[in-house]
């Protein structure tokens, strides 16, 4: 699919599909791309509240996204250079790598497992609660109460801006380049 437009009237575009490549396309339907396998997107504009649920093996590059519940319960995501705005994104994702992205989203990465976020900006409250084996490397993390109830959490060379009440009941190994407003040491 190339140089196309799927408007908001295209409610449930591309379900149960495999081996799809989508380039320079607008995906504006509410439930685009569900339960698909082996998907590549490049240069796409996505406005879809329930985009990418239960997707397996998706590569996304140079895309802009507005979504709620983005990529719910998906795995093997390889994302590069995304601009994303929304909430409740990346919940329950597994085995994924996200690089050179800007995410402005609350409640992101809840219950994520085996995920690496690298060279990115992640802005939003309640980041990555209940995650397991998630690594943030060379990232800027902005927002209240991030990274609570985590197991095997790693922060490598990260900045934390306006972050308070961090790391509640988390198992964390961190190298942080900035001060942190507060750390919640409740056990």
Which residues are covered by each model-predicted region?
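Long, distal/terminal scaffolding or interaction modules
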Residues: 1-187
């Amino acid at each position: 699919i190339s140089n196309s437009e799927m408007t908001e009237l295209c409610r449930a575009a591309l379900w149960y599909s495999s081996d799809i490549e989508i380039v320079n396309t607008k995906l504006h339907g509410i439930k685009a791309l569900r339960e698909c396998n082996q998907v590549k997107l490049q240069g796409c504009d996505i406005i879809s509240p329930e985009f990418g649920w239960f997707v397996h093996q998706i590569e996304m590059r140079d895309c802009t996204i507005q979504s709620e519940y983005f990529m719910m319960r998906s795995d093997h995501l390889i994302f590069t250079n995304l601009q994303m705005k929304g909430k409740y994104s990346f919940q329950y994702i597994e085995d994924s790598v996200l690089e050179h992205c800007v995410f402005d989203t609350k409640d992101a990465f809840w219950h994520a497992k085996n995920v690496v976020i690298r060279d990115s900006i992640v802005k939003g409250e309640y980041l990555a609660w209940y995650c397991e084996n998630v690594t943030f490397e060379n990232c800027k993390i902005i927002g209240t109460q991030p990274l609570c109830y985590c197991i095997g959490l790693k922060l490598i060379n990260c900045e934390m801006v306006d972050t308070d009440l961090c790391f509640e009941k988390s198992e964390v190994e961190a190298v942080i380049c900035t001060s942190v407003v507060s750390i919640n040491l409740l056990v």
